[in-house]
Amino acid sequence: MADTPNASGEPGELYLDAAATESVSPAVIEAMTPFLTEAYANPASVHQPGKTAARALDAARASFAAALGARPDDVIFTSGGTESDNLAIKGIAMARMRKLGLRPVCGFAEADGEQPANCRPRIIISAIEHPAVAQSAAWLHEWFGFEVVRIPVDAQAHLDLDALERELDGEASERTTMVSTMLANNEVGTVEPVEELVRIAHAHGVPIHVDAVQAAGQIPIRFRDWDVDALSVSGHKFGTPKGLGALLVRGRTPIEPVLSGGGQERGLRSGTQNVAGAVALAIGLNESNARMQAQYRELVASRDMLIDAVRRVAPRADLTGDPERRLPGHASFIFPGVTGEALLVDLDARGIAASSGSACAIGRHEIPATLLAMGLEPS
């Protein structure tokens, strides 16, 4: 929780929307500023200022990787979670399609317009993915004929592991390019059993991408220990400016670039590298991890106190997501008979900033797809 600015720029009373974005940490601003004002050279340049920038980039990459249980060469710096998810989904799926010998849009030119099932590439995602994942999968379907399989979730937003097993059994696994799933849901806070998901995917020889955008800085991330193939994070969720993120990719994982250009970031993300941004990511994540370790129990206690208080004031309110296996600072509710918009307007008038779903869907006046996937009826 933090102060929120009102329309005049003065602090309001209470900011309860950190799941959408955090404030930029003062330590992050202090650390990155010299690379905006003094050591601003292109890290690819051969002169001394360029070498200074390159050393700072390497140090930031190593620090950032360690904070995620990864190696420096796993890290591909990007512009945020959306780009990281796009690179993972499109890059891995296309590379795997070619590796498996599958043909894109094969059969679409035939008279019946249908694609033979035995050559159609597949991608498996969950029913509650962020639009950056879901729409990337839809793009693969629209342009290359991919079959998009959505794994259902239960009433607490946990993936149906048996359904995932069934979708990977038999010949279907030979056409499955990848699996992609959230680590923690941004709308209801449920944390998925990532190690079990990795075990299932790898048992069938299929790589798995994990969207950890909502989880990084809130719960420990152990990229290498989990044996994940690719993992996305976004800096503005843990105290950096917006527009910063990363995709972790194991060297064994087939992946193709989405952007063409100078071949920076292992040839997977062309564009002049943002040294100040890399420094911000390293400082922000390490600071968030330290705070998480020091204040985890306090944060959980505050969350549970809020949940209890809401239930006392509104006995009909339903907590969404898993009541136990959830992010430590996340609480979301359904209030029967009250629209989210009306509630938020009232809270805002009282100086309380909150959200009624993913910030990426604000203004659409639709029932959140996550709640529908959990089996909740529109009301």
Region locations from a protein language model:
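Pyridoxal 5′-phosphate
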Residues: 1-379
